[in-house]
Amino acid sequence: MDETENNTSIDSVEVGPSSPRVVATPRIPIPVMMRETPLSTKRERQALTPRFRRPAPRMIKTVPQTRSIWSVRKDTTPQLVTPHGPQELESPHYDRANTQTFFEQVFQIDEIIGRGSFGEVFAARCREDSRLYAVKVSIAPMRQHSMSKYREAESHMIIPPHKNLVKFYRAWEETDRLYIQTELCEQSLQQYCSVQHALPENEIWNIFVDLLEAVHHLHSNDMIHDDIKPENIFLTKHKICKLGDFGLVINLKNPNDVKSAEEGDSKYLAPEVLNGKPTFASDIFSLGVTILEAATDLDVPSNGDAWHQIRNGQIPERFFVGISSDLRVLIEQMINKEPMKRPTSDALRKHLSIRTRLDSRRRYILSMDMRDGFCNLMSSILVWCMAFLSVVFHPVTRFHEAINNRRSELCAQFVNNQQHTPIQTPETSKVYSESLTGVALRQASQISPFDFSDDENPPHSQRRLFTGPVSRRLNFDDEMEDEEQATCSSSNSSAIETAEDSLSSPKKPVIPVTRQGTPKSARRLIPSYRNRSGSRDPTHHAGAGDSMNSSILDQERTDRYLRMRLAEQQLDWNDHSNMIDEAPPPMSCPPRIRRSLRDMPRMPVLNFNLLDEPIKKGKEKPVVEPAELRQRPMRNGLKSLRSRMASFQGSSGDEN
């Protein structure tokens, strides 16, 4: 035997017995781009092709359609498509004066779920019932006299409803475009298979039974789908298959549909359709290829030798690994090249493997429909109950809300009326100002001339409550002092009227202090305490240089001082009776300690300059003991009331 007989990698050339031996050359390899791609699965094809593939650009007409100036302008009013002709479309959410279309006004677009040669499919929520629908919108404007103008909409309306067909709601025309509103499913079979790849056989049987029921329903009504493929098969949330997209449906009762029949997708097209017209057997062939793709994850070719290989039944055995013999036999019968040898939909339903699963599948679909209906009913009842309760309890909730709002206003008003207590005047309190003036706090906040800041001494521009400064100083002896000192202003203005002013001018009405937190040094004497300890003659005059007048002035000073002491005692008594046990502000001296420190003598002022002076011999002064300092009497001489009282205005005992 020649060595080259079994060599498949070189060309064998037959030569005669007398001819010389010809050297065989290796066969020229065929480029990869020109090789015929064998049958493969989708996973294998994805491994050979790049992950990202740019989609083909859409055809867009950049030049607008030219119209004659004499052409009649078309009406843009939406027209409802019905079997008896177009009718006017109405909706409570549609406004004719609005420039938006009926679809944009009545529906709220969520996303685009599909694109095709006919148009785009949107997932939109209807504002009339707040439910999601699938709305298919044609891309190109429809021709006025086209025979297939309402073909898909009419097919939906002619076909009786079925549980395995996509439910149709309505269709309308607007601005030469057709809108079809149908049921919204969860995903298509193509999307489901691209994620799951080879499906379990139990799911394959369920898909097979559902699609067979849909095809049988169409064939029993003399309808041919002519476009059965995974892209037009939809799955619900309960994994129930439904057949949709009736754009190429052929009604055998309508001669126009038979004449204008179009071919579907070439991947799932029966071979006899290339030379003829679609039939019931062509739908069975498309259904068989669809089940084959779902069961084996086969990458179905659209043309070439692989396309004919499937039509001839030359499918490798490796694709049927793990598939039962019953399912394989049914698939091979359905994709038979001869249309007469293919089983009909009625014959497939009578098959033993399908008949046993048909009843269980019907019960499952019925139970899911009952479950969805019960859920919708309960949700409707719940909504009505909530509406009823809201109507019943709405007045109660409004009343309760009004009470809470009023309570909040009162609390906020009380908090806002709480005056800030200055740090330097801890003796004042909320009740103190009312006891001093007898006026409510709310009214006091409007007419008080003080700014109640942390500083006890207000600015000079705001001290308008008292009279002008005195022209003379009132001097008292040390023996006239008492525990309680008369108050006066901490500034240059004084609260004590001079003798000359009091005798020469009539008494002016005293303006009461009506602000909470008034410092003790700014108190105004109440008129009721003026004449408590004695009265004086308003006609009496004091001379400037007369000795008799000086004695009278001394007596008048003494009487006035006694009256001031009585007024201070009365005010302190009111403070004690209306005292509220409040925590003293931080960095301030408690009132009890201040009162106890008033009786103690003042601390001596240390003069450190004496230490720097040289001490002369013979003139050394004895050092004064601390005990003597504590027992040293206060300085004699005249001292004004303002300077004496200013020493007790500090908040701590060590102030000078």
Curated annotation (Swiss-Prot):
It is found in: Golgi apparatus membrane; Cytoplasm. SUPFAM superfamilies: Protein kinase-like (PK-like) (SSF56112). It is a peripheral membrane protein. Pfam families: Pkinase. Mg(2+) binds at N232, D245. The active site is at D227. Its main location: Golgi. Keywords: ATP-binding, Cell cycle, Cytoplasm, Developmental protein, Differentiation, Golgi apparatus, Kinase, Magnesium, Membrane, Metal-binding, Nucleotide-binding, Oogenesis, Serine/threonine-protein kinase, Spermatogenesis, Transferase. One of its GO terms (cellular component) is cytoplasm. PROSITE patterns: PROTEIN_KINASE_ATP (PS00107), PROTEIN_KINASE_DOM (PS50011), PROTEIN_KINASE_ST (PS00108). SMART domains: S_TKc. One of its GO terms (molecular function) is protein serine/threonine kinase activity. Residues 107-354 form the Protein kinase domain. The keyword Metal-binding applies. It catalyses: L-seryl-[protein] + ATP = O-phospho-L-seryl-[protein] + ADP + H(+); L-threonyl-[protein] + ATP = O-phospho-L-threonyl-[protein] + ADP + H(+). Coiled coil: none annotated. Residues 1-11, 486-505, 646-656 have a biased composition (Polar residues). Acts as a negative regulator of entry into mitosis (G2 to M transition) by phosphorylation of the CDK1 kinase during oocyte maturation. Required for embryonic development, germline proliferation and initiation of meiosis during spermatogenesis. Required for chromosome structure during mitosis and negative regulation of nuclear envelope breakdown. Belongs to the protein kinase superfamily. Ser/Thr protein kinase family. WEE1 subfamily. This is Membrane-associated tyrosine- and threonine-specific cdc2-inhibitory kinase wee-1.3. It comes from Caenorhabditis briggsae. The lineage of its organism: Eukaryota, Metazoa, Ecdysozoa, Nematoda, Chromadorea. The gene is wee-1.3.
